[in-house]
């Protein structure tokens, strides 16, 4: 069971625009199909270049084995903390759009199937919400190394003054 931490030009990365938006979002990113490093990089760049997103801070990439269905490639995971002026519903729609843009199929063959890009909204400000299509904070974030390890690495960088 291999686990590895990768760094690249964009992971970890801090980018600040002059605009400082009020909504703080924590995202979990995952990819294990096609070229996961390239997909995560391009996803980061998409968020970075979006006009409604200000600060964006990414973790290093955490490579770890899949959970659930294990006969698939390892996952490349990262977390992103960002500031946006988008409302929760508009941000949720943006996430769906980005996933589709990177080849994500919403209808999966089975639970925990491989995917080109998975973006989970872990938290949006302090919102607590339980609906059919969205639960905040994400109900299983605290059980997943794929979220906990990148968030812990971001916390270390934060304490060093990176955010």
From Swiss-Prot:
Alphabetic keyword roster: ATP-binding, Folate biosynthesis, Kinase, Nucleotide-binding, Transferase
GO molecular function: 2-amino-4-hydroxy-6-hydroxymethyldihydropteridine diphosphokinase activity; ATP binding; kinase activity
Disulfide bonds: none
Enzyme class: transferase
Known EC number: 2.7.6.3
InterPro entries named among the record's database cross-references: Hppk, Hppk_sf
Reaction equations catalysed: 6-hydroxymethyl-7,8-dihydropterin + ATP = (7,8-dihydropterin-6-yl)methyl diphosphate + AMP + H(+)
Pathway membership, UniProt: Cofactor biosynthesis; tetrahydrofolate biosynthesis; 2-amino-4-hydroxy-6-hydroxymethyl-7,8-dihydropteridine diphosphate from 7,8-dihydroneopterin triphosphate: step 4/4
A GO BP annotation: tetrahydrofolate biosynthetic process
Pfam families given in the database record: HPPK (PF01288)
Function: Catalyzes the transfer of pyrophosphate from adenosine triphosphate (ATP) to 6-hydroxymethyl-7,8-dihydropterin, an enzymatic step in folate biosynthesis pathway.
Family: Belongs to the HPPK family.
Record's protein name: 2-amino-4-hydroxy-6-hydroxymethyldihydropteridine pyrophosphokinase
